[in-house]
Amino acid sequence: MSCPYAGSGNDHDDAAVPLSTEVGKIYGEYLMLDKLLDAQCMLSKEDKRPVHDEHLFIITHQAYELWFKQIIFEFDSIRDMLDAEVIDETKTLEIVKRLNRVVLILKLLVDQVPILETMTPLDFMDFRKYLAPASGFQSLQFRLIENKLGVLTEQRVRYNQKYSDVFGGDEDALTAIRSSEQEPSLLELVQRWLERTPGLEESGFNFWEKFQQSVDKFLEAQVHSAMEEPVERAKNYRLMDIEKRREVYRSIFDPAVHDALVRRGDRRFSHRALQGAIMITFYRDEPRFSQPHQLLTLLMDIDSLITKWRYNHVIMVQRMIGSQQLGTGGSSGYQYLRSTLSDRYKVFLDLFNLSTFLIPREAIPPLDESIRKKLINKSV
């Protein structure tokens, strides 16, 4: 029996069959490759002293900027979807999909650093003089990513100048910076979304009150267990540890303590938003909280990967120019970059610290029938 999908052998045409008769752009025109592939201007070559690795340096940083543009594109669309009173399940799924895309892009950017490291410090020195006053500190798109994500101006490390000063008289860049500082960041929008978590209502399930009761019971059970410790020194140690844990929980149960931590920069979320994040974490196996939990996990992944990228960048800079030299843009180079690895630049710091407030699974307040019905019918 002949293959039902095979032709007769007489109707084969070597000429390519166009998918459409409409006039369109060919591959190179659509991607504007004439401009893209002609944008690598090696200053060492113009100086009649071409340095081979300058080409790699340019290509790598241009690739970074292209991916930065895509990240901004994704962040803007995600912020648009989050900027609503109610976010239905289909939108949450799309937000999760796009956040995951950003995560994969950032993984690619982290893995791109070792390619630059194939260049030796001596190779870099051959063309470094041509870079001044250019500097990665002047990457407008990376600053926009930070602002759109939620890095606050007061949280930034200042070295000699405000971060936006490097853009000098570039009014378009300064306008973009100001706009990104004023519009709602991803952090602010996620905070609003968490504040609406169903189950937090005092007139309803009132998760927060039930959680406090569960924590009190959990700690009292630990005290009771510690009191049965036959060795006095071990008993006192356990009791001291329990008191420390009680103080940790007080930092989330007492709104005044929480607000003080926010003002100090040790917390980011509002008290209500933190409650929502804890509730989603505890009940992540519930169908309605499955996607929100994925969303929170992806936000932590983004923070982690940006930190990893910063770290790889720091190590590469130290390897290329050491820890004492100034950067090409006049910043303190290695010292400045190392300072950006602190929690000051971690936007979703509170999500990383949620594990501090966990209690054993058996101590988690059970959902009653009314909240289960509400979760079935309510968008988060």
UniProtKB/Swiss-Prot annotation:
Residues the record lists as binding heme: H313
Cofactor note: Binds 1 heme group per subunit.
Pathway: Amino-acid degradation; L-tryptophan degradation via kynurenine pathway; L-kynurenine from L-tryptophan: step 1/2; Pigment biosynthesis; ommochrome biosynthesis
A Gene Ontology molecular function term of the record: metal ion binding
Reaction catalyzed: L-tryptophan + O2 = N-formyl-L-kynurenine
Database matches in InterPro entries: Trp/Indoleamine_2_3_dOase-like (IPR037217), Trp_2_3_dOase (IPR004981)
One Pfam family from the record: Trp_dioxygenase
The keyword Oxidoreductase is annotated on this UniProt entry: yes
CC cofactor: heme
An annotated GO BP: ommochrome biosynthetic process
Protein origin, superkingdom: Eukaryota
Record: residues binding substrate: F57, I58, I59, T60, H61, R128, T328
PANTHER family assigned: TRYPTOPHAN 2,3-DIOXYGENASE (PTHR10138:SF0)
Name used for this protein in its record: Tryptophan 2,3-dioxygenase
Gene designation per UniProt: v
